[in-house]
């Protein structure tokens, strides 16, 4: 299934599912992608794949009709972060992220860099606390707050800077929706369908639990990419989410 590269031709999906592509081999990744339907999910490209295969790989996914979450977690001086975010927008991605711990000036510069793109600008999301982090990990960094409290502090700063939302754990989603409102988007990794292995994520939920918690976009990796029938797995997840809505 191959569509043209223009953003207007990309398949529209109402699914909250974002499939994390974690492949060492480009052909393996594209082989997987060709088995699934862009109406059933969006795709996340992270640091490893982007470093290996570059912007052209993102374009190949877009040509197949998929919206792309470019998960590079920019964290740099304000000017550099702003230019990086603008480059992602030039690439036509659907979503891009920065680290909230980069501070207010960095996040504000990143947001301002997207103003010239108008309605074609990607969603700009900030990372709060990585889902693999526990209280002991934060303590090692000199942070005495709990992961939940630290994530909320960073989320408040993110909203103050005018970004579209945050990456957070599903456990934080209920409170974040109450505190920051329905328009503030919540993107959550560590989502595993019932019966899946937890992998390296520590704070996990099922898709149905995440939806009930207020998560807007849920990132799912190996339960889909390692499925014998990924297309059917996606359809089953989406059907379950529709029943839960």
UniProtKB/Swiss-Prot annotation:
Annotated substrate binding sites: 22, 44, 71-80, 131, 192, 201, 221-222
Keyword Lyase part of the UniProt annotation: yes
GO MF, one annotated term: orotidine-5'-phosphate decarboxylase activity
Record's keyword annotation contains Nucleotidyltransferase: no
Reaction equations catalysed: orotidine 5'-phosphate + H(+) = UMP + CO2
Active site positions, chain numbering: 73
Keywords assigned by UniProt, alphabetized: Decarboxylase, Lyase, Pyrimidine biosynthesis
EC number: 4.1.1.23
InterPro entries linked: Aldolase_TIM (IPR013785), OMPdecase (IPR014732), OMPdecase_AS (IPR018089), OMPdecase_bac (IPR047596), OMPdeCOase_dom (IPR001754), RibuloseP-bd_barrel (IPR011060)
Functional pathway: Pyrimidine metabolism; UMP biosynthesis via de novo pathway; UMP from orotate: step 2/2
Swiss-Prot/TrEMBL GO biological process terms: 'de novo' pyrimidine nucleobase biosynthetic process; 'de novo' UMP biosynthetic process
Enzyme class at the top of the EC tree: lyase
GO cellular component terms, semicolon-separated: cytosol
Pfam families: OMPdecase
Annotated HAMAP family: OMPdecase_type1_B
Function text: Catalyzes the decarboxylation of orotidine 5'-monophosphate (OMP) to uridine 5'-monophosphate (UMP).
Record family assignment: Belongs to the OMP decarboxylase family. Type 1 subfamily.
NCBIfam families attached to this UniProt entry: PRK00230.1, pyrF
Quaternary structure and interacting proteins, as annotated: Homodimer.
The protein, known as: Orotidine 5'-phosphate decarboxylase
Organism the protein comes from: Escherichia coli O139:H28 (strain E24377A / ETEC)
Source organism phylogeny: Bacteria, Pseudomonadati, Pseudomonadota, Gammaproteobacteria, Enterobacterales
Gene name tied to this protein: pyrF
